[in-house]
A protein has these predicted regions:
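Intrinsic disorder in cytosolic terminal tails and internal cytosolic loops
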Residues: 1-4, 186-200, 453-462
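12-transmembrane solute porter fold
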Residues: 5-21, 26-30, 37, 41, ...
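Helix-breaking motifs and short loop linkers at transmembrane-helix boundaries and internal kinks
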Residues: 38, 70, 91-97, 125, ...
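Conserved MFS/SLC helix-loop-helix module at the cytosolic interface between two early adjacent transmembrane helices
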Residues: 57-93
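Cytoplasmic helix-loop-helix junction between adjacent transmembrane helices
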Residues: 105-137
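Small-residue (Gly/Pro/Ala) motifs that create kinks and tight helix-helix packing interfaces
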Residues: 142-154, 158, 219, 415-423
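Hydrophobic transmembrane-helix bundles of small-molecule transporters
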Residues: 157-279
């Protein structure tokens, strides 16, 4: 690999790690944000919802935009947007403005994730597989150590530091990318100059994006408002109904759209692939329920500092990183289903362990649940990808990958919703135990699904 290629890979890697890093660092900051802005957990959870909803929408749109405006231009623009958001978020006068800057940050980091892999595929031809695997390490590594980094810097410098820490990464990535990422081909980007707004809106399925956003946000607002107030009011019902109607209209629109935001017709055509995405959504629901729930439990219920919370969460990240390469060798020999079955069992074990904890249990014992979920996450990250490729025809693998990412975001959004509904305004030991019981039931259903996959052969190629 040439020196220029190495610098290109470094610039892309530093850019794309910002999305998983910022999505994971925030898990340790939630109790601090509750205290600073004097809000309950249900309201503060929008710091999670907003980021993932924005990412779910921005990444596919920016992927399409890069074909028209150029990948280098989108990547550099994403760095500028991320820089502005990271600089302004600590200056937020209230929580509403913090949510706005969090959404802007999500859009900026999503721009880089959407085009980063494509830049490497196009411009690095020598040892391309090695380069792509290195980028995967940037992504998974950032997500794994995010809570640890977040815990340390919040403990030392307060919550604004989790935004300011992005600036050195952004500046370095921008300077290196400006010099080493080749300029976009003018013939590729010239199409955008002659494209009307109407044609552009059709290309990105603006109507579908709007219906999806309005429906999902309205449904979440209706549910969480009812939970927060402790009663179901007329306004809650109206907002919830708007959400249901919006999502229903979204489904109807997507089935007819020429270039749908989420190609729902693909689900009916390829049922094996559909089940993989359903399972992936459940996997992320389980994993992120622990990932976002446990730091708040440790800090609010057990009074553990941010620093020590980050240290404990590191056991989850390290186990995940160690398990991934082992899973790769195992799956090459035995296929994905044994690894997925083992992952479901580990998630069940970790969930049961949460239920057995009491208020006198040593805090270090939480590491057992974290280790179980960490190993299962390492197995899932490889096995689910392998299962997707086996269940998806080669001619739609690009579409399948897009749906796969959407399933991850939906699972994460559902995890935050589950935590908010179970915990309500404040975290409690009883609520965390109930959460563990619910996760145990969901994990058992995952084990059953994987056992069925083994029996019916749904993980074999379509």
């Amino acid at each position: 690999m040439s020196i220029r290629s190495r610098w290109l890979m470094i610039s892309v890697g530093l850019g794309i790690l910002l999305n998983p890093l910022n999505s994971s660092m925030i898990s340790v900051a939630i109790p601090r944000l509750q205290n600073v802005f004097h809000l309950d957990f249900t309201v503060v959870s929008w710091i999670i919802f907003s980021f993932y909803i924005a990412s779910a929408i921005a990444q596919p749109i920016m992927g399409k935009a890069s074909d028209l405006f150029g990948r280098r231009r989108i990547f550099l623009s994403g760095l500028v947007v991320s820089f502005v958001a990271s600089l302004l978020a600590p200056l937020s006068p209230n929580f509403g403005w913090l949510i706005v800057f969090r959404i802007v940050q999500s859009v900026g980091t999503s721009m880089m994730v959407a085009v980063g892999m494509a830049i490497v595929r196009i411009h690095i031809t020598e040892k391309q597989a090695t380069a792509l695997s290195m980028l995967s390490i940037f992504l998974s590594g950032a997500a794994a150590i995010g809570p640890f980094i977040g815990g340390v810097i919040i403990h030392l410098w307060g919550w604004p530091a989790i935004f300011l820490v992005n600036i050195p990464f952004v500046v370095t990535s921008f300077l290196v990318a400006w010099k080493h990422i080749p300029k976009d081909d003018p013939s590729t980007t010239s199409v955008s100059r002659n494209m009307s707004f109407r044609k552009w809106f059709e290309l990105i399925d603006a109507s579908g994006v709007l219906l999806f956003t309005v429906g999902l946000v309205a449904l979440l607002v209706g549910l969480l408002s009812a939970k927060s107030s402790g009663q179901i009011s007329f306004n809650n019902v109206i907002v919830g109904l708007i959400g249901f109607v919006g999502l229903g209209a979204f489904v109807r629109h997507e089935l007819k759209a020429k270039a749908p935001f989420i190609p729902l017709r693909t689900f009916a055509k390829y049922p094996a692939m559909t089940w993989i995405n359903v399972e992936f959504m459940i996997v992320n629901l389980l994993f992120y329920s622990l990932f976002f729930g446990l730091p708040s439990y440790l800090q609010i219920v057990r009074h553990v500092s941010e620093f020590h919370t980050g240290m404990l969460m590191l056991s989850l990240g390290l186990c995940s990183l160690i398990a991934s390469p082992i899973a790769g060798s195992w799956i090459d020999k035995s296929g994905p289903w044994p690894a997925l079955l083992m992952s479901g069992m580990l998630m069940t074990l970790g969930s049961v362990w949460i239920v057995t904890l009491d208020q006198t249990s040593p805090v270090i014992s939480v590491c057992l649940a974290l280790a179980a979920f960490g190993i299962s996450n390492g197995l899932n990250s490889v096995a689910m990808q392998a299962a997707l490729f086996r269940s998806s025809p080669k001619e739609i693998i690009g579409v399948a990958s897009g749906i796969f990412n959407t399933s991850r975001y939906l699972g994460t959004i559902l995890s935050s919703l589950l935590i908010s509904i179970v915990m309500g305004d404040n975290f409690s030991f009883e609520g965390f135990r109930i959460l563990g019981m619910i996760l145990t039931l969901i994990a058992l259903s995952l084990v059953f699904m994987n056992w069925r996959h083994k029996e019916t052969g749904q993980l074999h190629e379509s």
